[in-house]
Design a protein with these regions (language model features):
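Pepsin/retropepsin-fold aspartyl endopeptidases
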Residues: 1-127
Length: 127
């Protein structure tokens, strides 16, 4: 068991040719995906709002949030996902929001993303 990485292409939704590929750590404990801000700015992404965050070490921080087109290599699918502009030396993290958007869950035993059935609204939606 343990952490694993997947290859992700990150693109500007307004100009998809402006993009980069990187290995992202799959992090189900992170709500948002996290990318060094400089890399996002290089492809022309701008923030749409700020978000207060609690980091893994317990520190509180306010960071900028934007939206990017993510293509996860092993899924061969592209969706727009929220992304945090991290410090320039930060790790590349694929967070829970992106995983849910793609309808996948992390399976650390085989180090792969696996499809899951989406739950819509619980009890109220089933009425």
């Amino acid at each position: 068991m343990g952490m694993f990485q997947v290859k992700v292409q990150v693109a500007n939704p307004d100009d998809p040719k402006r993009s980069f590929e990187e290995l992202f750590w799959v992090d189900t404990g992170a709500l948002y995906s996290y990318v060094p801000g400089k890399r996002l700015e290089e492809i022309g992404l701008t923030s749409i709002r700020s978000r207060k965050l609690v980091l893994a070490d317990g520190r509180h921080e306010t960071r900028q949030l934007g939206e990017a087109r993510f293509t996860i290599d092993e899924l061969n699918e592209t969706l727009t996902c929220p992304v945090i502009f991290g410090p320039d030396d930060s790790l590349y993290l694929l967070g829970a929001t992106a995983l849910e958007n793609f309808g996948v869950d992390a399976d650390p035993t085989i180090k792969k993303l696996k499809p899951v059935a989406a739950i819509i609204g619980g009890f109220l939606a089933s009425r």
